[in-house]
């Protein structure tokens, strides 16, 4: 019985993470081929552990119409609508000590919740994700970062935006995968997810690749997400190039630290990131905000 349960959980994890129809658990030819592919790849199985959950978070956000345009600030309100409550509020239900506090806030309509919005489209730009694949990220950090990247790809595609994934490690290790809406397959996505470069860390190569995409590949309205676990300084020349490009294209750089709780790791991102999040502190609510730049 335990083996059958574990097998069913594995199927649900893989289909929920990678399928174009994550709620369809039927033994279709597409699902069977997907299961076989992912089962043969340790990297894809590891990513599945996080990706399915991330897809659920954003599906719920979309269902509840938390649609915010590029550069628009999200807003909260107080109430007792549990479908729009922040996950940090619902977390009070997890322990007996905080349940009375939650119930009191619920009765008084003091639950923090998203202000409901009508679905809107405000011409959001493309997304460029720079993903650190140096040797130090191998394991859970690499799987978590790749799951974030794959979620950003899905969101970009749904919004008819282009997406670029810049895999980076040392100064000579860099690979770029470009995904245009309607022009890539599931196999393309799986292939990109399996890539792992290994080696050292260099921030300048991915920064310059991102600038090149904006200037030469039609990503001039893109924003950048920069995911890393490492510390690396940019030269004055590279910082000047980035500042000039930001002035010309009006984009932001959002940094995500795979920090494992290390308190002082953000200093190397501060010179070029307008927003910095820590993986160790990210809530479901913060994950929603990262994708609505």
List PLM regions with ranges:
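Acidic/polar low-complexity segments with low predicted structural confidence
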Residues: 1-124, 284-290
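A generic secondary-structure signal
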Residues: 151-155, 209-216, 244
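Arginine/glycine-rich "motif VI" loop of SF2 helicases in the C-terminal RecA-like domain
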Residues: 156-158, 219, 245-251
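Acidic, Ser/Thr-rich peripheral helices and adjacent loops at domain boundaries
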Residues: 177-195, 273-282
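VWA/integrin I-like adhesion module and closely mimicked acidic/polar interface patches used
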Residues: 197, 230-280
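C-terminal helix of von Willebrand factor
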Residues: 202-208, 265-293
């Amino acid at each position: 019985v335990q083996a059958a349960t574990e097998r069913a959980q594995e199927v649900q994890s893989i289909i929920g993470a990678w399928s174009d129809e994550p709620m369809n658990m039927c033994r279709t030819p597409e699902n069977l081929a997907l299961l076989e592919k992912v089962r043969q790849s340790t990297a894809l199985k590891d990513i599945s552990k996080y990706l399915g959950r991330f897809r659920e978070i954003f599906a719920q956000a979309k269902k509840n119409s938390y649609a915010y345009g590029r550069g628009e600030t999200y807003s909260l309100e107080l109430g007792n609508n549990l479908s729009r409550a922040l996950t940090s509020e619902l977390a009070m239900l997890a322990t007996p000590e905080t349940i009375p506090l939650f119930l009191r806030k619920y009765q008084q309509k003091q639950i923090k919740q998203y202000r409901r919005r009508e679905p809107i489209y405000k011409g959001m730009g493309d997304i460029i994700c720079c993903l650190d694949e140096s040797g130090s990220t191998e394991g859970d950090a690499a799987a978590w970062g790749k799951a974030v990247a794959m979620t950003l790809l899905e969101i970009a595609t749904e919004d008819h935006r282009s997406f670029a994934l810049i895999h980076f490690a040392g100064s000579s290790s860099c690979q770029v995968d470009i995904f245009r809406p309607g022009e890539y397959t599931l196999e393309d996505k799986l292939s990109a997810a399996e890539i792992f470069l290994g080696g050292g860390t260099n921030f300048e190569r991915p920064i310059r690749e991102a600038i090149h995409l904006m200037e030469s590949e039609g990503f001039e309205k893109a924003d950048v997400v920069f995911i890393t676990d490492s510390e690396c300084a940019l030269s004055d020349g590279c910082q000047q190039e980035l500042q000039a490009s930001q002035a010309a294209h009006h984009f932001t750089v959002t940094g995500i630290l795979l920090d494992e709780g290390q308190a002082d790791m953000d200093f190397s991102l501060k010179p070029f990131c307008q927003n910095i999040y820590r993986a160790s502190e990210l809530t479901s609510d913060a994950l929603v905000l990262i994708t609505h730049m």
